[in-house]
Amino acid sequence: MAAVVALGANVLSAKSIICDIEGTTTSISFVKDTLFPYALKHVEGYLKNNWNEEATKTVVTALREQAEEDKKAEVEGVVPIPTGDSEDIIPEIVKNVEWQMSLDRKTGSLKTLQGLVWAKGYKDGSIKGHVYDDVQKAFEQWTENGRKIYIYSSGSVDAQKLLFEHSEQGDLLKYLSGHYDTKIGAKREKESYTSILKNIESSPEEALFLTDVYAEAKAAKEAGLNVVLLDRPGNSELSEEERKDFPVIATFSDLSFAAETKEENGGATNGKRKIEETNDDVAEEDKAQVYPNKK
């Protein structure tokens, strides 16, 4: 069992929460053991059944261009993708995808094709996005307390949305205010976090980044963000030195954000208590202003 961790006031008062996915909201094994094998198994069928779709044509062109770049760069083992009829091209695309995935490459064209294949699986119910048991409750509480939640992952924005829309705990997209992938920058570069802050119009002091990767945490800290590391089951072991640099938690329930509302005298009180006090004081006909969703 993880030891109780003291979290600083800046962490617990953060208004913008930026979450990684793998190892943070979602098991690393889900991507490795479910999503990747599904893409490998179904990519050929997807291409055959959707060959004339514009999205397919676009991604095939992108894969071919990537293969040409790899060939020029003398990347070992590259599988070229020819032009011609689908029956000639599809087997080579499959080989190219298998080669890239065997190297754990994250090229844009590969991620796009994976996303197209996964979309079909999510929508027909073959895939349900894994999220840890504490995620839905935490997302709900954080948003109710006035926090905004953003996702920053190496997976494409489309793939992120599919995972959270079709999660094991239902549609979680309603809790999310934005999504970012590596188009905004690499996750181990300080500038990426600065760009996200600018995009969401947040100061670094009011932002919190949650991740399981020390190098990402370090980059975010260099950009001025508050950072907490996640120690989930199956994650890479954090060293003692890494644990000294950042607070480490095992679950989102270890983060307790207090909902605060300003009183007329300038003080602050817990949001739940404030509503209860107000409810006692207002006339019956005015209660809809306190509980706007109640008739």
Swiss-Prot record:
> Any note on cofactor binding?
Binds 1 Mg(2+) ion per subunit.
A Pfam family annotated for this UniProt entry: Hydrolase
Keywords of the record: Amino-acid biosynthesis, Cytoplasm, Hydrolase, Magnesium, Metal-binding, Methionine biosynthesis, Nucleus
The record's GO molecular-function terms, alphabetically, read: acireductone synthase activity; magnesium ion binding
Q: Which reaction does it catalyse?
A: 5-methylsulfanyl-2,3-dioxopentyl phosphate + H2O = 1,2-dihydroxy-5-(methylsulfanyl)pent-1-en-3-one + phosphate
EC primary class: hydrolase
The EC number(s) given in the record are 3.1.3.77
Cofactors, names only: Mg(2+)
Known partners and oligomeric status? Monomer.
Instruction: Outline what the protein does.
Output: Bifunctional enzyme that catalyzes the enolization of 2,3-diketo-5-methylthiopentyl-1-phosphate (DK-MTP-1-P) into the intermediate 2-hydroxy-3-keto-5-methylthiopentenyl-1-phosphate (HK-MTPenyl-1-P), which is then dephosphorylated to form the acireductone 1,2-dihydroxy-3-keto-5-methylthiopentene (DHK-MTPene).
- Name by which UniProt lists this protein: Enolase-phosphatase E1
Q: Source species, please?
A: Anopheles gambiae
